[in-house]
Amino acid sequence: MESQHEEAKAEWIREQLDDEDADEYTSGWDDLSDAYDELNVHDEPYYEDWDNNWVAPKQTRKGIFQESVDTASELMELSLFPSVEDNVLIMLHGHIVAALEGYLSATFISATLSSNDFIRKLVETDPEFADRKFTIKEIFSKHESLKSDIAKYLQDLIFHKIDKVRPMYKSVLGIDLGKTPWLFKAVALRHHCVHRAGYDHEGNKVSVSKDDIQLLIKRCSDLVDKIDNDVVDMLKPKPQKI
């Protein structure tokens, strides 16, 4: 079963790279491998009805994130052998960053699909849609499937590419994520934690302490709180002018 999963993943990555000879040493392979794993982490689709309605998860997006960081906090309370603790902290770093990425992705999709104005801003500002071409006779069919196309595109988007996420939040939703150099570093470190079991490109073991995890939880939680408040304010009905 595991070999079938890896074969399917490799085939998908080669399709995205448009290179049938690509392998794990090809530029972009690791990022796409990460994306494939995250897109296939659930047995059932996260979003169910593409063409008609946005289907939210049973828990709130913030609730799902909070559950992840609460679990991480509880695990840090355990008394472990130093060698075990080092590896647990490495796994927790990857888990927390993944939880934030999931929140950023789900929140952006939900908010964008909630308004035709936001959908239009996305279509007009994102190069992926700006470069698409179709014939006159396709206008109506493309219009009917627009929301479905957008939902699928956003779900497939690699949301740990923070350089892409930040401007999308700003240009489409008008939400400024603020200065987050720590997040760029956390995402880069997550890559080593997830794909190299805590070792960097040179084979050096990365260092993650309990203080690092606690600080990461605080920064991620603060960012989630900010975005959640901004989204709530943004979606409030505007008072009518008399």
Model regions and ranges:
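Polyanionic, low-complexity intrinsically disordered segments
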Residues: M1-A56, G63, E67, G178-K185, ...
